[in-house]
Every structure is written in C-alpha cells, then in structure tokens.
Amino acid sequence: MLRFAVLGHPVAHSLSPAMHAFALESLGLEGSYEAWDTPLEALPGRLKEVRRAFRGVNLTLPLKEAALAHLDWVSPEAQRIGAVNTVLQVEGRLFGFNTDAPGFLEALKAGGIPLKGPALVLGAGGAGRAVAFALREAGLEVWVWNRTPQRALALAEEFGLRAVPLEKAREARLLVNATRVGLEDPSASPLPAELLPEEGAVVDLVYRPLWTRFLREAQERGLKVQTGLPMLAWQGALAFRLWTGLLPDPSGMEEAARRALGV
C-alpha cells in the first residue's frame, strides 16, 4: 500500500489529505495520505520515518527551507527557489522537488489567466519566491514588493527582478498576493483598492477565506481573478505524479479541496 503524508506545523486544517484521497481513489490506487504535525525540531526524525515507510511526502510551513539540508538530492529548481515542497523516497534515499512554481503556472493556464507582464508579486517569502521564479522563467517582466523593502531588494537582486513601491501596482497586468494578508483578518487587503490597475488579472494565494477582500475588490474593478485553490490543486497533482507517474485530475482535486473547505 502506498503511504503519503503532509508534514508541517500546524497541519490539522490542511486540505492535502482530501485532495490526495481523491487522487488515490480516482486512479484506483490503494494507499493513504496522512497529516503529520511536524514542528521544525521534529523534522530530522520524521524524515527517518519517511525513508523507512513512505513513498513520498509534501512539506509545508515551516519546513520547506529547512528540509534541503536533510535530503539526498534536490532539484535545480528547488535549489534556486530555496524551498522543497515535495519529497520522493526511493530505496531509502530522499529526493526533493518544488511543484509550487510549475503548479502556479499550470493554474494560470487552466484558469485562462494571460501570462502578460509586468507582473507584480506582493511578498518576498517562500510563496513569493516560488511565484516570482515561475513568472521569470515564463519570460515575464517581474516586479516584487515586500513590507520590508530589504527583503524585496534581496529577492530582486538574486533573481534579476525589480523591487518596486506599492504604487507601481497600477501599471501591472498581473498581480499576485503571496503574503498572508487576508488570512488572519478577512477584512484586510494587501493593496488599497485605488491602486488596482485598470486591466489585467489578480491572483490571491490565500484560500481561507476563499474570496478575500483583495479578490472581491479586483472583481468589482472588472479584473480577471483567481483564488488560491487552483495552484494548491496543481502543485498537489504534480507532486502525485512525481510519486506515482500518474497525473490525477487537478480540477477534481480542487473540488475535493472546496468540499473540505465547506464552500
């Protein structure tokens, strides 16, 4: 039987078990997908268990960066991004990948979001790094903003991007919220409505709540919008393919996540 899990802290409300249960069932595979609460200090011990008994695991906060030092091999893309979200176990060896970046691009394509720049990524943390890397690899002009300007400058220098003030949002054709704004406080938005562009698309990686203030205001402006669930589903589907060689239906995984969210 195939064993999978998501490791992170906290993971009690993770949507990954619901998505991967759909993937296993839809492809007729016998297996399980667990949620393992794993604080940072518990990571080495957990990975020993993975070496022994699991086909693969997903990693979420706060483990994506720390895991690199504990793996036998890390893909060049994951090394550049500085984060691993998918681990494959083969004969006791652990191989690390990042499916966040390609998952983001696949979600845009599936949702009919034009890959047109300039693209402004709000946030220079782990999610922001993956998104900025993906958009740059797709050939877009990429701008980055962060509440702490030094972090935006560091990311821009590392990836060959441009750190910009928030006011540049008006000139962007693709806006991506890769911050946690809107998660703890649903009434908050990372961007004042008056700074939204006149045309283009907006993506919010926050999916609790699913329709954030940021997305609602963008939709009212007439912009094309996408919630955080398509990227979540696509990164999960690509991880599942790394583990099994089979690609589950991302739209089915997204629907499973919606049901788990209760929306």
UniProtKB/Swiss-Prot annotation:
Sites where the protein binds shikimate: 14-16, 60, 85, 100, 207
Residues binding NADP(+), per UniProt: 123-127, 146-151, 205, 228
Organism superkingdom: Bacteria
CDD domains to which the protein is assigned, alphabetical: NAD_bind_Shikimate_DH
Pathway: Metabolic intermediate biosynthesis; chorismate biosynthesis; chorismate from D-erythrose 4-phosphate and phosphoenolpyruvate: step 4/7
One Pfam family here: SDH_C
A GO term from the CC aspect: cytosol
EC category: oxidoreductase
SUPFAM superfamilies named in the record: Aminoacid dehydrogenase-like, N-terminal domain, NAD(P)-binding Rossmann-fold domains
Reaction equations catalysed: shikimate + NADP(+) = 3-dehydroshikimate + NADPH + H(+)
Biological process terms in GO annotation: amino acid biosynthetic process; aromatic amino acid family biosynthetic process; chorismate biosynthetic process; shikimate metabolic process
GO molecular function: NADP binding; shikimate 3-dehydrogenase (NADP+) activity
Active site: 64 (proton acceptor)
EC code: 1.1.1.25
Database matches in InterPro entries: Aminoacid_DH-like_N_sf, NAD(P)-bd_dom_sf, SDH_C, Shikimate_DH, Shikimate_DH-bd_N, Shikimate_DH_fam, Shikm_DH/Glu-tRNA_Rdtase
Keywords per UniProt: Amino-acid biosynthesis, Aromatic amino acid biosynthesis, NADP, Oxidoreductase
Protein family (similarity comment): Belongs to the shikimate dehydrogenase family.
Physiological role: Involved in the biosynthesis of the chorismate, which leads to the biosynthesis of aromatic amino acids. Catalyzes the reversible NADPH linked reduction of 3-dehydroshikimate (DHSA) to yield shikimate (SA).
Quaternary structure and interacting proteins, as annotated: Homodimer.
Protein's UniProt name: Shikimate dehydrogenase (NADP(+))
Organism of this sequence: Thermus thermophilus (strain ATCC BAA-163 / DSM 7039 / HB27)
Lineage, highest ranks first: Bacteria, Thermotogati, Deinococcota, Deinococci, Thermales
